[in-house]
Amino acid sequence: MNLMLTLLTNTLLASLLVLIAFWLPQLNIYAEKTSPYECGFDPMGSARLPFSMKFFLVAITFLLFDLEIALLLPLPWASQTTNLNTMLIMALILISLLAISLAYEWTQKGLEWTE
């Protein structure tokens, strides 16, 4: 019951904060707020340059693989359990998923930097 009350309170509080932020008007909109800031100096060039999509895709791929590898970190502690077969099967499934997704990225040329 305590857990349900805590979850309900957190959900209601988060929803209330989102609604307040959504319905409050934007105040003090003027040109200085939308201009780029470079340590107090006038900008040397345009700060609205297009972003490299290849860099973005490689960065997202790196984050996904990094998160999947982070799932492998508890394996030394999991190897001390009595149910070792389940742990090994899950680890092999995760490593296979990593290998298959790496092969897919490679074949789709998602890891190539040059166009």
Curated annotation (Swiss-Prot):
Keyword Flavoprotein: no
Enzyme class at the top of the EC tree: translocase
Record localization: Mitochondrion inner membrane
Catalytic activity: a ubiquinone + NADH + 5 H(+)(in) = a ubiquinol + NAD(+) + 4 H(+)(out)
EC number: 7.1.1.2
MF terms (GO), sorted A to Z: NADH dehydrogenase (ubiquinone) activity
Bilayer topology term: Multi-pass membrane protein
Pfam families, per the entry: Oxidored_q4
GO biological process, one term: mitochondrial electron transport, NADH to ubiquinone
Alphabetical UniProt keywords: Electron transport, Membrane, Mitochondrion, Mitochondrion inner membrane, NAD, Respiratory chain, Translocase, Transmembrane, Transmembrane helix, Transport, Ubiquinone
Transmembrane segments: 3-23, 55-75, 84-104
A GO cellular component entry from the record: NADH dehydrogenase complex
Protein purpose: Core subunit of the mitochondrial membrane respiratory chain NADH dehydrogenase (Complex I) which catalyzes electron transfer from NADH through the respiratory chain, using ubiquinone as an electron acceptor. Essential for the catalytic activity of complex I.
Family: Belongs to the complex I subunit 3 family.
Oligomer status and interactors: Core subunit of respiratory chain NADH dehydrogenase (Complex I) which is composed of 45 different subunits. Interacts with TMEM186. Interacts with TMEM242.
Record protein name field: NADH-ubiquinone oxidoreductase chain 3
Gene name of this polypeptide: MT-ND3
